[in-house]
């Protein structure tokens, strides 16, 4: 079994990566904290709705929206009629799962019985059980979940931003799918997706806590195959076929809210192929956002003091191999005026130039936030999965942050915030008339 140790003298942290004979990568991050945390992740998310197999690349398979999320729900069902949530609960562990655009994760946290809980995690994720009956019963449950998200102003506003930015990319579709799309899901389809994507070469096990590595590997040897099977997926989609400009510049809906909310999306099509370069771009944008949009900054003070925005203004840059965007979200009586004020501030700032002191302050904040994330087993395990699934190495991120210069940020800023790459998504209150 291949073993690789990663260390950081800056962070004084270390973890080990094992390449199990089954093809599964096992990451063990030792941490002497009271909580254990484990994630069994798979690189299968909501955007993976179109693919083919290497043995027949011309046969393109398209699956209904929401399949990855539906599969996540049903994997907890066992052939003996039990539910794995109940098994975790009996062990004193808190289990959960989630589906994102790019990945699916099955996880638990525990303060006791860690190894028994780990056995249950590996066992149920590697033993699917789908029937006509349990699929039919789940359709109604997920339809209610879809309705709940559709009734959420913040979710509607977020997806409106994505729909405005992207014309073709699967990210514009709801992770849960639609009430119509999930009705097309069958046991055969679920098994086909499971067999295609839930290959151990396409998965990872991420563990953080005060654990014994030998015991973890012993459990993996007990429950996993001794040989690897070939991973045959070829992604076939329109996810890279996007124009630089946004699809629509303005999206509006009306819902039962007291004050308008908004999401501003800035599309970024300059996506590096190299994972380290993607991580660096994410770090640069995070520093830039802190310089421009933080509560300590001139822009926020101006907007808030003139009552143009409510106190909470959030901002985030997101990047993956197939899409990237910057987003700013908040609450305002007139979101269009807020966007105009932001663009005017950006235009003036490009003439005046970024302040070096703001760069130093923002970089220190980002560095401190990253270091602080290593105080939590949950934060470590989730970040470990995120970095690893993107082909990056978590401990090297601190070196990436350290390496970023003022010129790096200034260069990105010079080409950011183009008007034709901006979408404004707004949820307005219902018209009283």
Each PLM stretch: what is its role?
Residues 1-83, 191-302, 423-433:
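His/Glu-rich zincin catalytic helix
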Residues 74, 78-235, 275-280, 289-290, ...:
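Charge-rich, well-structured scaffold segments of protease-associated domains
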């Amino acid at each position: 079994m291949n073993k690789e140790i990663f260390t950081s003298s800056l962070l004084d942290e270390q973890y080990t990566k094992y390449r199990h004979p089954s093809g599964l990568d096992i990451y063990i991050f030792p941490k002497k904290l009271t909580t254990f945390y484990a994630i069994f992740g798979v690189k299968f998310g909501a955007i993976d709705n179109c693919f083919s197999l290497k043995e027949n690349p011309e046969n393109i398979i398209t699956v209904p929206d929401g399949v990855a999320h539906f599969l996540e729900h049903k994997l907890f069902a066992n052939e003996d009629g039990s539910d794995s949530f109940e098994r975790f609960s009996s062990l004193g562990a808190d289990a959960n799962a989630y589906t994102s655009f790019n990945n699916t994760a099955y996880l638990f946290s525990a303060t006791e019985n860690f190894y028994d809980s780990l056995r249950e995690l590996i066992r149920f994720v590697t033993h699917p059980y789908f029937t006509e009956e349990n699929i039919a019963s789940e359709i109604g449950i997920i339809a209610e979940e879809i309705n709940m998200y559709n009734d959420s102003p913040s979710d509607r506003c977020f997806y409106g931003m994505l729909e405005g930015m992207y014309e073709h990319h699967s990210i514009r579709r709801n992770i849960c799918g639609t009430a119509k799309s999930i009705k097309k899901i069958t046991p055969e389809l679920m098994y086909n997706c499971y067999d295609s994507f839930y290959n151990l070469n396409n998965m990872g096990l991420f563990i953080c806590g005060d654990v014994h590595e030998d015991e973890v590997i012993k459990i993996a040897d007990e429950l996993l195959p001794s040989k690897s099977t070939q991973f045959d997926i070829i992604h076939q989609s329109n996810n890279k076929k996007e124009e630089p400009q946004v699809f629509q510049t303005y999206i509006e809906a009306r819902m039962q809210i007291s004050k308008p909310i908004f999401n501003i999306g800035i599309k970024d099509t300059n996506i590096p192929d190299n994972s380290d370069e993607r991580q660096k771009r994410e770090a640069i944008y995070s520093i830039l956002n802190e310089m421009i949009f933080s509560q300590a900054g001139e822009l926020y003070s101006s907007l808030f003091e003139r009552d143009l925005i409510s106190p909470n203004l959030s901002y985030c840059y997101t990047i993956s191999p197939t899409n990237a965007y910057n987003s700013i979200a908040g609450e305002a009586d007139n979101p269009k005026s807020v966007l105009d004020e932001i663009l005017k501030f950006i235009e003036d700032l490009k003439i005046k130039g970024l302040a070096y002191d703001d760069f130093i302050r923002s970089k220190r904040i980002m560095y401190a936030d990253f270091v602080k994330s290593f105080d939590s087993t949950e934060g470590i395990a989730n970040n470990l999965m995120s970095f690893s699934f993107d082909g990056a190495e978590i401990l090297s991120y601190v070196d990436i942050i350290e390496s970023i210069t003022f010129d790096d940020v200034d260069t990105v800023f010079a080409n950011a915030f183009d008007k034709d790459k901006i979408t404004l998504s707004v949820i307005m209150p219902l018209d009283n008339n």
